[in-house]
Amino acid sequence: MFDIGFGELMLLFVIGLVVLGPERLPVAVRTVTGWIRAIRSMASTVQNELTQELKLQELQDSLKKVEEASKNNLSPELKASMEELREAAESMKKYFKGINSAALDPTEPHTIHNPLVTDPEALHDGVTPAEGDRQAEAPLMAPSVKASAPADSVANPGEPIAAAAIGQPAAASVDAASTSPSAKVSAPADSAANLATQAATPAAPAPAPEEPGRAATATGPASSTSPLNNDR
């Protein structure tokens, strides 16, 4: 490998023996031989890889030459079949391109009132954003209001005022019962009962006025007897 002769090896051995001595010389020889073996193995692996790469390159070149020769030497039937396959592939490509262009560019342009729908849920429901805006802009129907109280008041104008007066304490007692605690519910009920009893019982007759002559006679004897009582 290094083209070293026997005389050169002996010269190196003597120099190493003088420099290193008899104790270090065997260790140095072992290390040098290990390095030489590693270098040889590395060189052999690199050489093998280079040869493999060269062989692969030669095979590729030979395959290219064979393909070119086979193309030139094809029969007319094979050439016609290859051309038909190419035309079919081109037509399929054009068809798919047309479908994609139609899907991306519809006849109606995408404007503010008709934007492009990309949400799958909106596409599934079939509602476009423009239709949703139109439905949102539609006027809301006002709910019908039933005026039942005025109709009842017009239908029954001649109800007695006493019924309203009796109903007011009852309503007040119901409101007090709903808002106040249970301990204060009995007071409005008792007051309503007292009002009902007072309204049911007749009023007592007023005392008749006394005549002036009778009042004088009644007071006269008392005044006459008063001096006698004092004398006694």
Swiss-Prot record:
**What biological-process GO terms show up in the record?**
protein transport by the Tat complex
Membrane topology designation: Single-pass membrane protein
Instruction: List every stretch annotated Disordered.
Output: 108-129, 176-232
Q: Where in the cell is it found?
A: Cell inner membrane
The Swiss-Prot or TrEMBL record describes its family as follows:
Belongs to the TatB family.
User: What GO CC annotations are associated with the protein?
Assistant: TAT protein transport complex
Q: What one GO molecular function would you report for this record?
A: protein transmembrane transporter activity
Q: Where is the composition biased (Low complexity)?
A: 189-203, 214-232
Its transmembrane ranges are 1-21
Tell me, in a sentence or two, what this protein's role is. Part of the twin-arginine translocation (Tat) system that transports large folded proteins containing a characteristic twin-arginine motif in their signal peptide across membranes. Together with TatC, TatB is part of a receptor directly interacting with Tat signal peptides. TatB may form an oligomeric binding site that transiently accommodates folded Tat precursor proteins before their translocation.
Keyword entries, A-Z: Cell inner membrane, Cell membrane, Membrane, Protein transport, Translocation, Transmembrane, Transmembrane helix, Transport
Name of the encoding gene: tatB
* Assembly and interaction partners: The Tat system comprises two distinct complexes: a TatABC complex, containing multiple copies of TatA, TatB and TatC subunits, and a separate TatA complex, containing only TatA subunits. Substrates initially bind to the TatABC complex, which probably triggers association of the separate TatA complex to form the active translocon.
The uppermost taxa in this organism's lineage are:
Bacteria, Pseudomonadati, Pseudomonadota, Gammaproteobacteria, Enterobacterales
What is the name attached to this protein's record? Sec-independent protein translocase protein TatB
Q: Can you list the disulfide-bonded cysteine pairs?
A: none
Q: Which organism is it from?
A: Sodalis glossinidius (strain morsitans)
